Amino acid sequence: LDLGKQLMPIGMLVVLDSILNRITQNRAKGRNTFIFIDEIYLLFQHEYSANFLFTLWKRVRKYGAYATGITQNVDDLLQSHTARTMLANSEFIIMLNQASTDRLELAKLLNISDLQMSYITNVEAGHGLIKVGSSLVPFANKFPKNTKLYKLMTTKPNEKF
């Protein structure tokens, strides 16, 4: 759906408000809410949605919700001061192979050592670095391609069921 530049902020407001309403409804029912925002950097291109998301990010856990932001190019995300603050204060971050400029920015923001940087530099799919609190842990998440689990988890369309 292409709303164009004029209607995009209004469209985002409607969607974000709907998410907040669902979180509130689920809390009243004793349910957790899991929010996955793909290409999250797009929300930081508009001041209102960036501020709304910043507030939501800080409050959702109190409402039994868990927010996950996803982006392939961290550099796009880090253009926003609000996004940088959110990323720096996030307790859990998964980093896969990163482009050179993205690695440098992440290293500065998250205090990643040169050795730790090697885990997100020219690595195979499924390898990377996890930030949990103040700890950084390397990981290798390899599954045989001929398994159902692999077919469920792969992001490659030609390898899905």
Predicted ranges, named:
Residues 2-120, 145:
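Conserved P-loop NTPase motor cores
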Residues 110-161:
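Conserved P-loop NTPase
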